[in-house]
């Protein structure tokens, strides 16, 4: 087998795993069709272990679904799952100061904020990728806004609590 065939073989293996294993698992077991978004704590058999939702995972899931839609196959269910997570993020995951929560309940009630901007970065790439998938410029603008907010949070002294206290 030459290098090109070898790489093609692995690409097909990964695509097959994504489309026949990974995406169906999360769509069937993690997608919260009642409240929106995705449950983030599943056992290997798909059973729900905890109903709290990681906010950064909402952004990652929305991005993954839109990216797969844009680059693997035009699977409408993937686009719908991306939109579900994006709507959940928009409705429940931003605090009044623009900083995102780290964790919320299944219904979107805030549980915890962190000093990091992981939630913002994943939300920004999710909005951007969803905009590419749909052509809706609102989400491109939203991606840029969230990105600029994250930059501001990181560059504004005292906005994010220090990770350590100086001695």
Description of each model-found segment:
Residues 1-167:
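Glycan-recognition and catalytic cores of secretory/periplasmic carbohydrate-active enzymes
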């Amino acid at each position: 087998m030459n290098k090109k065939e070898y790489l093609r073989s692995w690409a097909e293996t990964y695509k097959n795993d994504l489309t026949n294993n990974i995406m169906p698992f999360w769509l069937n077991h993690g997608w919260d069709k009642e409240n929106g978004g995705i449950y983030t704590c599943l056992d290997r058999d798909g059973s729900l272990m905890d109903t709290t939702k990681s906010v950064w995972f909402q952004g990652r899931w929305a991005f993954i679904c839109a990216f797969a839609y844009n680059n693997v196959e035009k699977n409408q269910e993937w686009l719908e799952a991306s939109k579900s997570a994006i709507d959940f993020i928009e409705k429940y995951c931003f605090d009044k100061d623009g900083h995102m929560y780290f964790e919320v309940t299944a219904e979107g009630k805030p549980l915890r904020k962190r000093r990091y901007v992981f939630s913002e970065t994943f939300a920004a790439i999710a909005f951007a990728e969803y905009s590419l998938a749909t052509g809706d410029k609102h989400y491109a603008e939203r991606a840029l806004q969230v990105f600029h907010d994250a930059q501001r949070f990181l560059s504004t002294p005292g906005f994010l609590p220090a990770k350590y206290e100086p001695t």
